[in-house]
C-alpha cells in the first residue's frame, strides 16, 4: 500500500512540474529588454544621437534589424 501511494504521488508530482511554467512573463520581458539594450548599444555605441528612443518593448515584440536601429538612432 505504501509503495502504491508513493508511486501515485510521484506521478502527480511529475505531472505538476511538467505543467508549470519555467519563467514568468515579467522575467522573460526583463531578459529581453536587457538583451535589447545591449544590442542597441553595440549597433549605436553612443546610443541615440537623434534624441529618438528605440522602443525596447517593440524591439522585443517585433524585432528590429540592425539597419532599422541605425536609421532610428544613429543615422549617418
Curated annotation (Swiss-Prot):
This protein's record includes keyword Secreted: yes
Signal sequence, renumbered to the chain: 1-24
Keyword Disulfide bond annotated: yes
Family membership noted in the UniProt record: Belongs to the insulin family.
Cellular component, GO, one term: extracellular region
Record's subcellular location: Secreted
Annotated keywords: Disulfide bond, Secreted, Signal
Protein name: Probable insulin-like peptide alpha-type 1
Disulphide linkage map: 32-60, 44-73, 48-74
Amino acid at each position: 500500500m505504501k509503495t502504491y501511494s508513493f508511486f501515485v504521488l510521484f506521478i502527480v508530482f511529475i505531472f505538476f512540474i511538467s505543467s508549470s511554467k519555467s519563467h514568468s512573463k515579467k522575467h522573460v520581458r526583463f531578459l529581453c529588454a536587457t538583451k535589447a539594450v545591449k544590442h542597441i548599444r553595440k549597433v549605436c555605441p553612443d546610443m541615440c544621437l537623434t534624441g529618438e528612443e528605440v522602443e525596447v518593448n517593440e524591439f522585443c515584440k517585433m524585432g528590429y534589424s540592425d539597419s532599422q536601429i541605425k536609421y532610428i538612432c544613429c543615422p549617418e
